[in-house]
From Swiss-Prot:
Its EC number is 7.1.2.2. HAMAP family: ATP_synth_beta_bact (MF_01347). ATP binds at residues 172-179. This is ATP synthase subunit beta, chloroplastic.
Length: 498
């Protein structure tokens, strides 16, 4: 198999007809193309079909070479609908892999898998482009330092801290706040780290992609007046697109993120929603290419495909890519090959709970289900580790006592257990926090809470110094000083009412 060299030819857009082939067969989104002898395109080369269909409509379809079949034939997967294509049509070999625009020109814009803008805001500066297929950074380039990526979100920083240059899985159903959490992270990294974000919508609903774009404009993450001031680039390959586009859109987003890391030497946040759809698209393509299915009907190359994407998401000596990936779990079965393969690559898992969302505690991160490999005393320090463990123990004890409380009531508990329950309820409320991106809806200003402030707050609650304060004072505040101030206000209000 000949793999294409990873250099990109910037002149490909001019499309010189140096190497022409013809369509021999069309099977849905898969094309077989015949080329002259000794002029076979390399694997991953982009092929372009231009022409008119029987109705006279203009056709412009880009495909990617996947297999060399022998007899001067290649099999390619289309990145857009193949309606109107016919046998015998001319196919141009571009001589290079798909290349997409990278750099500052991509910020504030929406792209498709081919790097074409789809937001009706005019053309994008394409002087700097990059091929979507690259090898992962070499060992010698990797940065092996373990450091915490502070998000300013209390529950995340304390109980399941993110690793700089790590990969985080975001597990949650519909309507529990995945999108709002993603937007807050984009906002916080822009403010605190001066970094940029890339959002890859892989096989998601078009409506959700549109909602995200509108919300980003409202919250100022995308600056409509001065687009260059925006902090995020969006790449979408929606559910209605062919499997080829859904399989490659993650790589397009990753390529844009890699440029910010390697050339601009920035810390980048890469969001992928949803990583399961990437696997699903790969499975469809695999079947279309005639490969034998593997376990549960997935592609036999599942681990390789996942690895080639995930291994490129890493920290180098130049900068870091920290990736947050939404993971759909089919039929809630974590042993399904798709989520199981994803788990192997994750450094932390953030689990969103419908129960907490129903209580009105946002972000609805489940403090007991969420995990992180970074929560070790040698990495985060003894104080952080001890505080996190004591918070978890208190919440776990509260969870165990809930059945007894439901049947017998609080009065039947021992003095010690009643104290634990009171503190756990304060902790639960203190884990909530007002978000900057939700200011429009809640009316309360967002809060960024530093890690040292977070630890100080929870230590005070656990020590019992704040046992006299009402639990309502801890709900939707930033640091612990705001909670004590809120308690004083609540006390004054109740006195005035009396």
């Amino acid at each position: 198999m000949r793999i294409n060299p990873t250099t990109s030819d910037p002149g490909v857009s001019a499309l010189e007809k140096k190497n022409l082939g013809r369509i021999a067969q069309i099977i849905g989104p898969v094309l077989d193309v015949t080329f002259p002898p000794r002029k076979m395109p390399n694997i991953y080369n982009a092929l372009v079909v231009k022409g008119r269909d029987t109705a006279g409509q203009q056709i412009n379809v880009t495909c990617e070479v996947q297999q060399l079949l022998g007899n001067n034939r290649v099999r390619a997967v289309a990145m857009s609908a193949t309606d109107g294509l016919m046998r015998g049509m001319e196919v141009i070999d571009t001589g290079a892999p798909l290349s997409v625009p990278v750099g500052g020109a991509t910020l504030g814009r929406i792209f498709n898998v081919l790097g074409e803008p789809v937001d009706n805001l005019g053309p994008v500066d394409t002087r700097t482009t990059s091929p979507i297929h690259r090898s992962a950074p070499a060992f010698i380039q990797l940065d092996t330092k373990l450091s915490i990526f502070e998000t300013g979100i209390k529950v995340v920083d304390l109980l399941a801290p993110y690793r700089r240059g790590g990969k985080i899985g975001l597990f949650g159903g519909a309507g529990v706040g995945k999108t709002v959490l993603i937007m807050e992270l984009i906002n916080n990294i822009a403010k605190a780290h001066g970094g940029v974000s890339v959002f890859g919508g892989v096989g998601e609903r078009t409506r959700e992609g549109n909602d995200l774009y509108m919300e980003m404009k409202e919250s100022g993450v995308i600056n409509e007046q001065n687009i260059a001031e925006s902090k995020v680039a969006l790449v979408y390959g929606q559910m209605n697109e062919p499997p080829g586009a859904r399989m490659r859109v993650g790589l397009t987003a990753l390529t844009m993120a890699e440029y910010f890391r390697d050339v601009n030497e920035q810390d980048v946040l890469l969001f992928i929603d949803n990583i399961f759809r990437f696997v699903q698209a790969g499975s469809e393509v695999s079947a279309l290419l005639g490969r034998m299915p593997s376990a549960v009907g997935y592609q036999p190359t599942l681990s390789t495909e996942m690895g080639s994407l995930q291994e490129r998401i890493t920290s180098t000596k130049e900068g870091s890519i920290t990736s947050i990936q939404a993971v759909y779990v089919p039929a809630d079965d974590l042993t399904d090959p798709a989520p199981a393969t994803t788990f192997a690559h994750l450094d932390a898992t953030t689990v969103l709970s419908r129960g907490l969302a129903a209580k009105g505690i946002y972000p609805a991160v489940d403090p007991l289900d969420s995990t992180s490999t970074m929560l070790q005393p040698r990495i985060v320090g003894e104080e952080h580790y001890e505080t996190a463990q004591r918070v978890k123990q208190t919440l776990q004890r509260y969870k165990e006592l809930q059945d007894i409380i439901a049947i017998l009531g609080l009065d039947e508990l021992s003095e010690e257990d009643r104290l634990t329950v009171a503190r756990a309820r304060k902790i639960e409320r203190f884990l909530s926090q007002p978000f900057f991106v939700a200011e429009v809806f809640t009316g309360s200003p967002g809060k960024y809470v530093g890690l040292s402030e977070t630890i100080r707050g929870f230590k005070l609650i656990l020590s019992g110094e704040l046992d006299g304060l009402p639990e309502q004072a801890f709900y939707l505040v930033g640091n612990i000083d705001e909670a004590t101030a809120k308690a004083t206000n609540l006390e004054m209000e109740s006195k005035l009412k009396q």
